[in-house]
């Protein structure tokens, strides 16, 4: 080789050659990923990030620096760098003119045969991300039905009379079910209801307009249909999305609506309502919860017509992490009884579940319902909801139902509870006799499982048809007890607080709190099992002032005063101070920061 050729094509070290080859491979891989994404019709940021992260992990800092140097040399002299990176064929020398006239490789457009194939793992990620993006984009592409935006005097009267606050006031309440702009196949199911409840009337216009909503309302206010009607209506317009084949040989349909609930009983109840409503348009709902085997639930999820899932956070996260539940196409997410889920310690599970779903930028609509509006719920809403409309029916503080008659009996001796219990059972059934056509239902609450078992035995010995509902029972036994109580086979049900929240048991005429719960929140939700759907009810509470009850006396009396209930004079001997609530982990020294910014996710390469 002549001196001129040496100058034109300087000899490079092995490391520099290797770095240039890596740079070429990286450019080709990026170009191939872009072409594959263009063929799918989707160019999402997630695909770019995944491909970029995969490539960056395989490169060291030293190679990155050398690649930058090579790129600079190519920009200055493309023909020289191209000639240097190409190995000349054996037994054949290239002239200087031939080298300079050759087209640089770095600027050439690769053909299909030259494009390097992505790895199987990258192809799977690309296909999954493309399918999810297509599903959420189709949800966003569906136009929202037209709803009125002008408030009339009738609307303002409705809001005032029901003590409803809209923040901000964008949509007036929908006062007639027949005015709902929904799928015509769904309308006959709703026509059996005379009129919407306050939370339904205010939620439907905003949710049908594809807005995120936070609903704060008392238990028994019809929240299931408040979020269920817009969700099922949206899915009735969306095409089903088929997932990829899983390791067990199952081909599951991807879920498009996810509802999270704090307890198995509430999840089962919401599932029943959504199943009945979804049947009108051929949608199937699956309920997933712990306490039973996963295999049966996984088989149901694998059915192609399964598009709605109602579940508890623990089992939902378990199935999502194992790949048996695909949440990448969820376009409608509901957090039901959000305050209860946070109280039960499910916040981390909820955050991990939401991480499996698309973001609101990809078209996901998020709905959150709660009985109260504490700081923990506000923080969760600010993180995952996009400029939500907040609907408050009544107060956002804890308050009891004013339609429930409250009777408080202060007992000096806890042993008097059994006698007073049987007295109230007999008195109530005398006024409201039990019959097959009009069963009388009485709900008795105990604090602990052993106490529930003892009370069940005591009531049965007194000659009443009684069942039980507590944590030591199998899931099958719990279902049977609930069904017997709902159908009237057993008119008395003894339960722990596992049944105190969210259960919609029709026509519960009397609630008896044998032992006061550990919090006033649980007291309100226990009493909320009666007086539902606009009806009246009655609650009897035995109060002894022992153990935890003394410290809750002040808050208990505040709840009674708010609903205008009579407070016995015997309560005067208990302190009226309302104790500051303590954080479960940090105690009384925990500081809530309502204006704290949302957490930022930081990724380290």
From Swiss-Prot:
UniProt motif (Q motif) ranges: 175-201
Biased amino acid composition, Basic and acidic residues: 45-55
Top EC group: hydrolase
Residues annotated to bind ATP: 217-224
Catalytic reaction(s) noted: ATP + H2O = ADP + phosphate + H(+)
Biased amino acid composition, Basic residues: 56-66
Start and end residues of each stretch annotated as Disordered: 1-124
Family indicated by similarity: Belongs to the DEAD box helicase family. DDX5/DBP2 subfamily.
Protein name according to UniProt: ATP-dependent RNA helicase DBP3
Organism: Cryptococcus neoformans var. neoformans serotype D (strain B-3501A)
């Amino acid at each position: 080789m002549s001196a001129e050729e040496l100058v034109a094509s300087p000899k490079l070290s092995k490391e520099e050659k290797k770095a240039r080859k890596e740079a070429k491979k990286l450019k080709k891989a990026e170009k191939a990923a872009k072409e594959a994404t263009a063929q799918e019709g989707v160019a999402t940021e997630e695909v770019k990030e995944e491909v970029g992260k995969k490539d960056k992990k395989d490169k060291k800092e030293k190679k990155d620096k050398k690649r930058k140097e090579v790129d600079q040399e190519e920009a200055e002299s493309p023909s020289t760098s191209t000639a240097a990176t190409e190995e000349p064929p054996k037994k054949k020398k290239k002239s200087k003119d031939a080298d300079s006239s050759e087209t640089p490789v770095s600027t050439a457009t690769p053909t299909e045969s030259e494009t390097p194939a992505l790895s199987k793992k990258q192809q799977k990620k690309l296909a999954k991300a493309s399918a999810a993006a297509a599903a959420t984009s189709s949800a966003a592409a569906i136009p929202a039905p037209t709803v009125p935006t002008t408030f009339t005097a009738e609307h303002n009267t409705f809001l005032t009379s029901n003590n409803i606050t809209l923040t901000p006031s964008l949509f007036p309440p929908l006062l007639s079910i027949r005015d709902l702009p929904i799928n015509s196949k769904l309308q006959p199911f709703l026509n059996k209801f005379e009129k919407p409840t306050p939370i339904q009337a205010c939620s439907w216009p905003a949710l049908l307009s594809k807005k995120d909503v936070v609903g704060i309302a008392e238990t028994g206010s019809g929240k299931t249909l408040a979020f269920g009607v817009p969700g099922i209506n949206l899915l009735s317009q969306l095409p089903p999305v088929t997932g990829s084949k899983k390791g067990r040989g199952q081909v599951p349909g991807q879920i498009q609506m996810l509802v999270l609930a704090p307890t198995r009983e509430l999840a089962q109840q919401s599932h029943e309502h959504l199943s009945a409503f979804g049947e009108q348009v051929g949608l199937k709902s699956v309920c997933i919860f712990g306490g039973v085997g996963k295999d049966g639930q996984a088989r149901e999820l694998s059915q192609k017509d399964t598009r709605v899932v109602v579940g508890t956070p623990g089992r939902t996260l378990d199935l999502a992490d194992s790949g048996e539940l695909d949440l990448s196409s969820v376009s409608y997410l509901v957090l039901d009884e959000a305050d209860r889920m946070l109280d039960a310690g499910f916040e981390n599970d909820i955050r991990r579940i939401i991480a499996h779903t698309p973001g609101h930028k990809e078209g996901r609509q998020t709905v959150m319902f709660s009985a109260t509006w504490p700081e923990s719920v506000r923080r969760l809403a600010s993180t995952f909801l996009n400029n939500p409309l907040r609907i408050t029916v009544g107060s956002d503080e804890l308050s009891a139902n004013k339609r429930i008659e409250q009777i408080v009996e202060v007992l000096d001796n806890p042993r008097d509870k059994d006698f007073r219990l049987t007295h109230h059972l007999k008195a109530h059934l005398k006024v409201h006799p039990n019959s097959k056509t009009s069963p009388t239902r009485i709900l008795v609450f105990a604090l602990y499982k052993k106490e529930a078992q003892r009370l069940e035995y005591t009531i049965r010995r007194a000659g009443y048809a009684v069942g039980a509902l507590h944590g030591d029972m199998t899931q099958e036994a719990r279902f049977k007890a609930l069904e017997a109580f709902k159908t009237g086979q057993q008119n008395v049900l003894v339960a722990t607080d596992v049944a105190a929240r969210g259960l919609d048991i029709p026509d519960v005429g009397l609630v008896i709190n044998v032992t006061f719960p550990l919090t006033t929140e649980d007291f309100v939700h226990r009493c909320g099992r009666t007086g539902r759907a606009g009806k009246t009810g009655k609650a009897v509470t035995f109060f002894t002032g022992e153990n935890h009850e003394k410290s809750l006396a002040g808050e208990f009396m505040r709840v009674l005063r708010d609903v205008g209930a009579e407070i016995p004079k015997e309560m005067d001997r208990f302190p009226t101070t309302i104790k500051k609530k303590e954080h479960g982990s940090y105690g009384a020294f925990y500081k809530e920061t309502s204006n704290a910014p949302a957490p930022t996710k930081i990724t380290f390469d």
